[in-house]
Amino acid sequence: MPMTAVTNVPADAPLADELADEDLVEMANLPEEDTGIPGTIFVSTRMGRHGPCVKYFDGRAGEAQPSCSVTIADPPRVVANSLPDHVVSQRAPLVSAWVALNRDALLQFWNEGASWTRAEVSRFLDGLKRLKER
C-alpha cells in the first residue's frame, strides 16, 4: 500500500486529552501478538471531535506517550503524528494495511461499540485479522 510522506500533519494529541472529555468509551490496546505489527494499536468507540481513527504507539500505549493517528478510511492515512519520523515512516504503512484489512469491523466498533455487551466486544476483538508477516 503506497504511503505518502507524513509531513505537515499536526502533532497527535496525548491519549489523556482525548479521554478526558468522554462519557463512555470502549477501548482496547492491541499488541503485536494481535495485530502482527510491532508496538500497540489503540482502538476505541467514537471519541473526540475527529472522525474514526486508531492510534499507534511504538511500544506500550500510554496517556502521554508519542503516537500517530490513522484514519479508518479508504485509504487509511496519517492525520496526526508525534512519533519520530523514522518510526512513522516504517510503521504507518503497516498500520494502514492493518486498518484496511479490518476496516468494516473497526468502523462498526467506532459507531456502535459503546452499546455492546462484554461478549460482543470480545467477539469483535477476537475477529480482528492479524497482518501477515511481510
Where are each of the predicted segments found?
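Short, charged/polar N-terminal "headpieces" of proteins
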Residues: 2-56
